């Protein structure tokens, strides 16, 4: 009798892990006036069906010793509700039957997913604790259209891919399953059988909200209800975030942080700080230093620490290196309470080819391009996202939305935009595929980036989310509105300014006169985009040397040059970004597995540089002339741009009410007495900043705090003053 309850072909297909529709045979099925229940439970010794009150409804006989059970159960004619009582060799389990539940995801939502709606990604995919018909469990859903079979595996089924094969929802390619009796905290992955029959390595969930801490690679069921119920206290901050044009008129001074190494815990095997520990230490530090924002290098889970986070595999999950995901929410909430914005680096260009990740996810090129001329990045040996695929584009946009919604981040810095925009980026002839018009522009990436920015600046995201592009070429309109043909970013990193100015400062002062244009060229295009001036981690690694180590001369000259450069940068048009350790002139390069050399602050010279950065930040934020027109030519005027023999530069910054700050920089170690400088207003001018002040580690040369502009024309101005320019120093002057 039992043999007739379970078809042999179904048994063989289930045991081989290749059944096309496990719900067609497993679970309860009506045959005439009987209810037949079939179960696949490899390793079970005895299986019975019980009513919810514990009464026995029937025994499921073993029809195959590999773990197939079947039997009829008593019923009252209605929909059967039963529990499975399972005797394992070393345990007893009573659970609902995963195959007694109907379809989970709404057809309309799946259609929206197939149409590329990021909201459907957030609504449908991943692991979500839910209650169905008074039964608690977890709904799993994953996109794998080319897979022959997908199973969810975890501690709850001994990682056995035969135990929980999923239901395919055609035509979306989404597989779903409700596993009763489990909840938040469960570890899981997916086991996929490719179309050609290969069983792939277990895959982490692309839409997981939480993960194990590396080097372990499982996804973790997040407590979604707890995240939704998180008690945010930042309503005032969120409502006050600058909108549209206002965000370009406010000060932005960004402290870039590698959270894994900012302050390790040496007493505990040099582990990384948790989010709560970072909140205790980093937020007061950033606040005290006068920075307006902290920007984290990528924090979406990444397997290899040496990638610094730029090869993520869980685009929705804060790295478990820093504790539970709620810890990041607490960090952001506390940062906002302190008046500090939080930006995160976000990586949509590429992903690593780790076996448990996105590469060949369902046995096909699902997230990446199939053609290696498009799908592999030659510099990083990583896979390139196929953003021209509707579902992949939606997946990435949903990730950005999730960071903005779930964690209240104030903005994202999009990594490696240049590599996305050009099909021949870092490729030789014959190694790339032209676009449909025969050109090198990646039209799919352009469309994706425009969509990303329109989404984050639209009603789908909290108001005030900012997007920043790391884009190193002259692609036009990176920060122009998408309606005008631009990409729609709020800001773009000014890589050209950074490279030119650092190259100038690397020269011996006696030779700088021959490279004078490197310091002035940035103003030729300074207002063609809205720029951030980045002194980032990329400039202090891979043998490039730290900022202070790039400067020539002895230690005093190097520190003085760096101070002068900071004075130049903070007065220059553009928002500011400085990488951790640079604010106190660390001598060594960035090392991801080592903490910055905080002990240098025992030395007065390094404390002085740190104090200077603090004071620059405070003055920059307090003086509208230095930030209100950062993105407008009306906010800048050269006073001296051609004194190459003396390596002196001077310029005026102003706001739209007429407030003025004049910066004058001397990039030689020669003090210059009686240096006449044209000024745009007469009378008393005070020294707002002198990077040679003794409190900053300088020699205290200068003008005793003030100069007088007399009616002596100079540099196109009707008034001028005679200045003493300290060596390797920058002065800021403002009308008294």
Swiss-Prot record:
InterPro entries to which the protein is assigned, alphabetical: A-amylase/branching_C (IPR006048), Branching_enzy (IPR037439), GlgB (IPR006407), GlgB_N (IPR054169), GlgB_N_E_set_prok (IPR044143), Glyco_hydro_13_cat_dom (IPR006047), Glyco_hydro_13_N (IPR004193), Glyco_hydro_b (IPR013780)
Catalytic activity, as annotated: Transfers a segment of a (1->4)-alpha-D-glucan chain to a primary hydroxy group in a similar glucan chain
Pathway terms, separated by semicolons: Glycan biosynthesis; glycogen biosynthesis
Signal peptide: none
One record GO biological process: glycogen biosynthetic process
Keywords in alphabetical order: Carbohydrate metabolism, Glycogen biosynthesis, Glycogen metabolism, Glycosyltransferase, Transferase
Catalytic class of the enzyme: transferase
EC number: 2.4.1.18
Disulfide bridge partners, by residue number: none
GO cellular component entries: cytosol
Active site, renumbered: 415 (nucleophile), 470 (proton donor)
Coiled coil: none
Molecular functions (GO terms): 1,4-alpha-glucan branching enzyme activity; cation binding; hydrolase activity, hydrolyzing O-glycosyl compounds
Function: Catalyzes the formation of the alpha-1,6-glucosidic linkages in glycogen by scission of a 1,4-alpha-linked oligosaccharide from growing alpha-1,4-glucan chains and the subsequent attachment of the oligosaccharide to the alpha-1,6 position.
Entry-linked NCBIfam families: branching_enzym (TIGR01515), PRK05402.1 (NF003811), PRK12313.1 (NF008967)
Family: Belongs to the glycosyl hydrolase 13 family. GlgB subfamily.
Assembly, per entry: Monomer.
Protein name per the record: 1,4-alpha-glucan branching enzyme GlgB
Organismal lineage: Bacteria, Pseudomonadati, Pseudomonadota, Betaproteobacteria, Burkholderiales
């Amino acid at each position: 009798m039992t043999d007739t309850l379970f078809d042999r072909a179904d048994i063989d297909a289930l045991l081989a892990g290749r059944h096309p529709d496990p719900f067609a045979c497993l679970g309860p099925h009506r045959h005439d006036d009987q209810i037949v229940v079939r179960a696949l439970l490899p390793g079970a010794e005895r299986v019975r069906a019980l009513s919810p009150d514990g009464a026995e409804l029937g025994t499921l006989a073993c029809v195959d010793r590999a773990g197939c059970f079947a039997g009829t159960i008593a019923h009252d004619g209605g929909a059967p509700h039963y529990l499975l009582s399972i005797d394992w060799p070393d345990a007893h389990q009573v659970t609902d039957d995963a195959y007694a539940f109907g379809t989970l995801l709404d057809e309309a939502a799946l259609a929206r997913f197939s149409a590329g709606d990021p909201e459907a990604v957030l609504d449908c995919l991943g692991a979500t604790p839910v209650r169905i018909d008074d039964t608690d469990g977890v709904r799993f859903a994953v996109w794998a259209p080319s897979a022959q079979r997908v199973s969810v595996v975890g501690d709850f089924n001994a990682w056995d891919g035969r135990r929980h094969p999923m239901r395919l929802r055609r035509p979306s390619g989404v597989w779903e399953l409700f596993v009763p009796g489990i909840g938040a905290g469960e570890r899981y992955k997916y086991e996929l059988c490719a179309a050609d029959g290969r069983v792939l390595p277990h895959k982490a969930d692309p839409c997981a909200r939480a993960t194990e801490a590396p080097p372990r690679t499982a996804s973790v069921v997040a407590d979604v209800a707890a995240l939704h119920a998180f008690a945010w206290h930042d309503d005032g901050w969120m409502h006050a975030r600058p909108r549209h044009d206002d965000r370009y008129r406010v000060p932005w001074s960004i402290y870039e942080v590698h959270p894994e190494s900012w302050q390790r815990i040496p007493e505990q095997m040099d582990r990384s700080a948790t989010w709560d520990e970072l909140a205790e230490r980093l937020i007061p530090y950033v606040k005290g230093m006068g920075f307006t924002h902290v920007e984290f290098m990528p924090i979406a889970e990444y397997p290899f620490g040496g990638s610094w986070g730029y090869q993520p595999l869980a685009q929705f999950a804060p790295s478990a290196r820093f504790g539970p995901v709620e810890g990041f929410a607490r960090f952001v909430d506390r940062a906002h309470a302190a008046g500090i914005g939080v930006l995160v680096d976000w990586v949509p260009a590429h992903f690593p080819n780790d076996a448990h990740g996105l590469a060949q996810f369902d046995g096909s090129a699902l997230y990446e391009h199939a053609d290696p001329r498009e799908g592999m990045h030659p510099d990083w040996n990583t896979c390139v996202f196929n953003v021209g695929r509707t579902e992949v584009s939606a997946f990435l946009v949903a990730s950005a939305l999730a960071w903005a919604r779930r964690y209240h981040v104030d903005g994202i810095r999009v990594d490696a935009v240049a590599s996305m925009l050009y099909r021949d980026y870092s490729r030789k002839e014959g190694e790339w595929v032209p676009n449909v018009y025969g050109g090198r522009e990646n039209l799919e990436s352009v469309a994706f980036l425009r969509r990303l920015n329109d989404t984050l600046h639209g009603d789908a995201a909290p108001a005030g989310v900012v997007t920043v592009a790391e884009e190193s070429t002259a692609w036009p309109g990176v920060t122009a509105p998408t309606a005008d043909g631009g990409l729609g970013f709020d800001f773009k990193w000014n890589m050209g300014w950074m490279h030119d100015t650092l190259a100038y400062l690397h020269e011996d002062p006696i030779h700088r006169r021959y490279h004078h244009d490197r310091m002035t060229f940035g103003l030729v295009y300074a207002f063609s985009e809205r720029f951030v001036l980045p002194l980032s981690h990329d400039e202090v690694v891979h043998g490039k040397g730290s900022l202070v180590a790039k400067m020539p001369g002895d230690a005093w000259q190097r520190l003085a040059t760096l101070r002068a450069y900071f004075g130049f940068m903070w007065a220059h048009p553009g928002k500011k970004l400085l990488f951790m350790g640079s604010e106190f002139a660390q001598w060594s390069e960035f090392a991801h597995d080592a903490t910055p050399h905080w002990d240098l602050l025992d030395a007065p010279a390094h404390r002085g540089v740190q104090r200077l950065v603090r004071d620059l930040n405070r003055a920059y934020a307090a003086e509208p002339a230095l930030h209100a027109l950062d993105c407008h030519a009306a906010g800048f005027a050269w006073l001296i741009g051609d004194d190459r023999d003396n390596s002196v530069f001077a310029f005026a910054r102003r706001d739209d009410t007429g407030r003025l700050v004049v910066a004058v920089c001397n990039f030689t170690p020669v003090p210059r007495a009686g240096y006449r400088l044209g000024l745009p207003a007469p009378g008393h001018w005070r020294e707002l900043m002198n990077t040679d002040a003794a409190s900053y580690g300088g020699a205290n040369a200068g003008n005793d705090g003030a100069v007088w502009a007399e009616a002596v024309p100079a540099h196109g101005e009707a008034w001028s003053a005679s200045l003493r320019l300290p060596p390797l120093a920058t002065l800021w002057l403002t009308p008294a």
